[in-house]
Each structure stands twice: as C-alpha cells, then as structure tokens.
C-alpha cells in the first residue's frame, strides 16, 4: 500500500474512532467510557485484525502528533485569562506541585526498590506522571526504555482522567485550584483535558500543574538517580 494512502487511512481511523467514542460518552456519561481509552482500544483492535504494525500506524499517527504539538499553544489562553489568580497563588501552586512530585517519586522509587527492580526499570517508571514529550527524553537520557515509559505515561494519564472525578468528589475538593493542580500533577495532558471540561479556571491550573511537574521532575529525577546509583 502506498505510504501516503496508509497515512491518510490511519488518520481517518483515529479521528473517526475518537469521534464515535466521544459521542458514546455523551450519550452514556460514564468515566470508564473515556474517549481516549475507547479510541485507543478500537485502534489496537483494528491494527491486530488487519496485521498493521505500530510503524505502519505511525505513518499517519506522526502527523497527528505534529498537529497536537501545535495545539498545545491553546493552553496559553486559560493561563492568560487567569493570570492574576495564578500570580496571587504562586507559593501554594509551587508547594503543591513539589509535594505531589516528591510523593510520586517516593511511591515509585521505594516500591520498586523494595521488590528488587533494577535502575533501568526505576528510570523507566519515574517519569510516568510527566507529559510525554518531556518524560520520554528524561527516560532516554538516563538509560530507561522509551517505549515502556510511553506506555506508563499513557496509562497514568488515562487512569487519572477516568478516576479523577470520583477521587475529587471523595476528597471533597471544591476549589478550582485544587482540582486543576491535582489533574495536571497526576495525569498531565489527559488530566488537563478533563479539567478543561469542568471549567476554564480548573484547566488553567491544570496546565500550570502539568508544566511545573515536567520542569521539577526533569531536574529532580537525574539528581535522585545520581544520589542512589
């Protein structure tokens, strides 16, 4: 099959499956009918049925990635609109994100250490709460497995976006700052998309949480590895 035709088919497959997954969730509101999850499972099913490799899918998937990279600029709008509230709460934002990052590191590092996993596995899993573009680079530079890091980043994001609303209700989080930072810190872009569905203010704080988590983690993960290895 011509590469351009295959790329177009993969793009159409992704867009169509996501569209119907979104419509399904709108008709049957349920956190487990997450459009990203349903569309991903649908894509995997189609690839397996027709024997299409990951590289074959990425002939079209890479174009979608380029478009998504450009759309990140859209996150600047909620940040700009809520800039005054962000400036008024800088210390709270930084302290909250730093605490979340450290708790994540402790959970992953101590658990894997206790079970005797190697440095490579620990490095692969530590960036799981960082947005993919940064997390992959951190894992690669420290000797982790890129493909597994991507898998854990996606899984973390999906779990956060699916269970986040239930956990926020359970914790009785009312503040848009708390909701947004929780989503951005724990489940990066997936969580930010979910926060934006709630309201633009939560989306703004989720964006800043996601950005700070990526920056802090990319600095602290190498330090942690140097200290213990």
Curated annotation (Swiss-Prot):
Main location: membrane
Keywords on record: Cell membrane, Cytolysis, Membrane, Transmembrane, Transmembrane helix
Localization of this protein: Cell membrane
An annotated GO cellular component: plasma membrane
Regions that span the bilayer: 4-21, 30-52, 62-79, 90-112, 149-171, 204-226
Protein's GO biological process: killing of cells of another organism
Topology in membrane: Multi-pass membrane protein
Superkingdom, natural source: Bacteria
A Pfam short name: LrgB
Protein family according to the UniProt entry: Belongs to the CidB/LrgB family. CidB subfamily.
Primary role: Increases the activity of extracellular murein hydrolases possibly by mediating their export via hole formation. Inhibited by the antiholin-like proteins LrgAB. In an unstressed cell, the LrgAB products probably inhibit the function of the CidAB proteins. When a cell is stressed by the addition of antibiotics or by other factors in the environment, the CidAB proteins possibly oligomerize within the bacterial cell membrane, creating lesions that disrupt the proton motive force, which in turn results in loss of cell viability.
Name listed for the protein in its UniProt record: Holin-like protein CidB
Gene it is expressed from: cidB
